[in-house]
From Swiss-Prot:
Superkingdom, taxonomy of origin: Eukaryota
Provenance organism: Tityus obscurus (Amazonian scorpion)
GO CC field: extracellular region
Tissue: Expressed by the venom gland.
The protein, known as: Toxin To83
Keyword annotations: Secreted, Toxin
Molecular function via GO: toxin activity
Upper taxonomic lineage: Eukaryota, Metazoa, Ecdysozoa, Arthropoda, Chelicerata
Length: 10
């Protein structure tokens, strides 16, 4: 999921 990638970046 793209959301997972965004959470990791944050």
């Amino acid at each position: 999921n793209d959301q997972c990638l965004v959470i990791e970046i944050l």
